[in-house]
Amino acid sequence: MSQDGTWSDESDWELDDSDLAEFGPVVAVVGRPNVGKSTLVNRILGRREAVVQDVPGVTRDRVSYDAMWTGRRFVVQDTGGWEPDAKGLKRLVAEQASVAMRTADAVILVVDVGVGATDADEAAARILLRSGKLVFLAANKVDGEKGESDASALWSLGLGEPHAISAMHGRGVADLLDKVLAALPNVAESTSLDGGLRRVALVGKPNVGKSSLLNKLAGDQRSVVHEAAGTTVDPVDSLIEMGGRVWRFVDTAGLRRKVGQASGHEFYASVRTHGAIDSAEVVIMLIDASEPLTGQDQRVLSMVIDAGRALVLAFNKWDLVDEDRCDLLEREIDRELVQVRWAQRVNISAKTGRAVQKLVPAMENSLASWDTRIATGPLNIWIKAVVAATPPPVRGGKQPRILFATQATARPPTFVLFTTGFLEACYRRFLERRLRETFGFEGSPIRINVRVREKRGLKRR
């Protein structure tokens, strides 16, 4: 690490091949844009995971999913459309597909039989033949005898038998999977893909730097990064070693607009962002420190709060923040982020690598708080002292009493107070502040539920 707190060699954080071997064989699904790759991935998974729309270029990253077939686990990778002469953003997408070709244990090349073998298909076939990988040719969109005849013409690609399938309707997919898995090493059904890894979701509005941060941490172009807002559509899982442990990062699509206003693949991606937050344990919320806080920031933050996840606020693009902007930002935080004063805060630059290593202790502290349990005895001793010093406000001419307190659950810490009457929201916020002052909980939300007990002898009818 250099003196300014940045990493001089990001490759120190990247998993090598031996680290990744324990997570099972990888099957990459590649091909030109709009040949049905994501539809095939969804068919393999048996559920709608990959974002699908009848428009070329919807999938832009290589996205990994835990899959199972006939009791055997493996990883299936969806990729963006591969084009040999692509430029700009399309070239970056094509590079992701090329990486998948190189790193996977087996490759399924998908070709549209209705179009036939194109120059791009032939170029992909040549690359795959030279790679020495296990390659299976999927002749997609076969729905009848003519399709089967068209599939036979794909022998010309030199990849062996074309497997006639219809990813949309499921035709031939089972036979294809049987042959793919027969060629792969066995993976025990009990193998866990996560292996107990802590799950991290990267969230924030479009173009805030989520993919850039993921790439900086992983040391490679794991997510497609482009100046155009919203270039990440699918959540992208990455296993990254930091601080002596491996973390599972999910790079979520930016929410360009409210879910109700989204359309097409933007809608599905926004739904997937909700899912990524729900499946995570700790969330890194990226905020553009160089610009004023926006309604989009607030909406994404509300999603995290509602999910009850541990939280780290990462103020990105700190290299663009001058002294005047820093003063303005502090006032914005005090005014607009009052509901998450408990969150861990790190000022970073995903572009330069400034202070990104500070994310590790921030996540660890947040997760430790999120996992915390307080024994019932010490909790009730504490609550009695607090109530004696500051009793609950009178309500309806009566002052409610807190009879008993217990922590019902962790993740997030949830407390239940048994009382003789309703506790005002302001008093519950007061109790939360005092809980944090005494027990910490930095980086984790706290939930306080109140249960009003009836008087003894009062029978329900």
Swiss-Prot record:
Please indicate which superkingdom the organism of origin belongs to. Bacteria
Q: Which residues form the EngA-type G domain?
A: 25-188, 198-371
**What Pfam families would the database entry show?**
KH_dom-like, MMR_HSR1
KH-like domain boundaries: 372-454
Q: Where does GTP 2 bind?
A: 204-211, 251-255, 316-319
The UniProt entry, under SUPFAM superfamilies, shows: P-loop containing nucleoside triphosphate hydrolases
Keyword hit for Repeat: yes
In its UniProt record, a GO molecular function of this protein is: ribosome binding
Q: Which of UniProt's keywords are assigned here? A: GTP-binding, Nucleotide-binding, Repeat, Ribosome biogenesis
Please give the InterPro entries that the UniProt record associates with this protein: G_ENGA, GTP-bd, GTPase_Der, KH_dom-like, KH_dom-like_a/b, P-loop_NTPase, Small_GTP-bd
What function is annotated for this protein? GTPase that plays an essential role in the late steps of ribosome biogenesis.
Q: Which PANTHER family match?
A: GTPASE DER
Its assembly, as annotated, is: Associates with the 50S ribosomal subunit.
Name it.
GTPase Der
Provenance organism: Mycobacterium leprae (strain TN)
Organism lineage = Bacteria, Bacillati, Actinomycetota, Actinomycetes, Mycobacteriales
